[in-house]
Amino acid sequence: MTIMRKSHPLMKIVNHAFIDLPTPPNISGWWNFGSLLGLCLMLQIFTGLFLAMHYTSDTMTAFSSVTHICRDVNYGWLIRYMHANGASLFFICLYIHIGRGIYYGSYLYKETWNIGILLLFLTMATAFVGYVLPWGQMSFWGATVITNLLSAIPYIGQDLVEWIWGGFSVDKATLTRFFAFHFILPFIITALVMVHLLFLHETGSNNPLGLPSDCGKVPFHPYYTTKDFMGVILLLTLFMTLVLFFPDKLGDPDNYTPANPLNTPPHIKPEWYFLFAYAILRSIPNKLGGVMALVFSILVLALLPYLHTSKQRSLSFRPLSQTLFWILVSDVITLTWIGGQPVEPPYIIIGQVASVLYFLIILILMPIAGLIENKKLKW
């Protein structure tokens, strides 16, 4: 008699994805972030659902409905702060997941990688429209500034902006549609995650050595379910510490002031996880050029499979490329810091140098390093 998980049509899918999945025996803790992203997504959907039950997407009542959630709804403050800080946690895991993909050459699985980039764009869009919903000062002005960037598109730019706004400024129509987008996008992300996993399981997971591991694969359960559970415990500990002790640490104090179109905040800036892209945008004094650099700063990831010149997949045994990788990580952290600073010397020049270095490392230095390493290994 066959085991039910191997014969039942639905359980068979789960079995092939999470139980009997052949997995490399040597994948490290850096591979935990995929499952942690799944946890973050579920956390965001559930907390978001409960927030949506009490939130009103109207300019007159949006701000006070968030206040009502925090003050009057049972554990509303906890749900709200879990949702707000859950977004930060999501992006921390996302950036580490992408970093691991770059370090270990996972981008050579082109379909999985490209769907991952699409997921990154959708997650950024979801986070942006979600940040507008509390209708505080930074919500309003952030929405105004970022949507206005589309006006840089020749010919159709201004019409496109007014179409997205639903009027001649960010107002009630904008808030209502942003709430609709914020509600539907996580479900689209969930569907794409399934496709992401489908393509990943077609090829099997990569490993730190970047070598084929078909001869020594182990079942996913119990080895990696246990390992992932350990990651979940650590992540939730960190997350609840942040939520319960430092809930406003990653937010902007300006968002505790209701939106006022007549009063501009001294420094308009997005949430911390967009600051690196915002710094790249600001480093170019031309509006269209800045917008193109902003989009390309993410799209450049799609070029990685075509810029891979090394005969080794992973960076594990490539000291020159490793050095460049960690300079790139430092550069992204520098850009994040610059994005939160005012536009004045010395921040302007630091931002410009860091932006040039970002593209220089990815597009030119990393491929050259791969060729040099091939030559040194006499390959």
UniProtKB/Swiss-Prot annotation:
A ubiquinone binds at H201. Its cofactor is heme b. InterPro entries: Cyt_b/b6_C (IPR005798), Cyt_b/b6_C_sf (IPR036150), Cyt_b/b6_N (IPR005797), Cytb/b6-like_sf (IPR027387), Cytochrome_b (IPR030689), Cytochrome_b_C_euk/bac (IPR048260), Cytochrome_b_N_euk/bac (IPR048259), Di-haem_cyt_TM (IPR016174). Binds 2 heme b groups non-covalently. GO terms for molecular function: metal ion binding; ubiquinol-cytochrome-c reductase activity. One of its GO terms (biological process) is mitochondrial electron transport, ubiquinol to cytochrome c. The chain crosses the membrane at residues 33-53, 77-98, 113-133, 178-198, 226-246, 288-308, 320-340, 347-367. GO terms for cellular component: mitochondrial inner membrane; respiratory chain complex III. It comes from the Eukaryota. SUPFAM superfamilies: a domain/subunit of cytochrome bc1 complex (Ubiquinol-cytochrome c reductase), Transmembrane di-heme cytochromes. It is found in: Mitochondrion inner membrane. Keywords: Electron transport, Heme, Iron, Membrane, Metal-binding, Mitochondrion, Mitochondrion inner membrane, Respiratory chain, Transmembrane, Transmembrane helix, Transport, Ubiquinone. Heme 1 (or BL or b562) is low-potential and absorbs at about 562 nm, and heme 2 (or BH or b566) is high-potential and absorbs at about 566 nm. This is Cytochrome b.
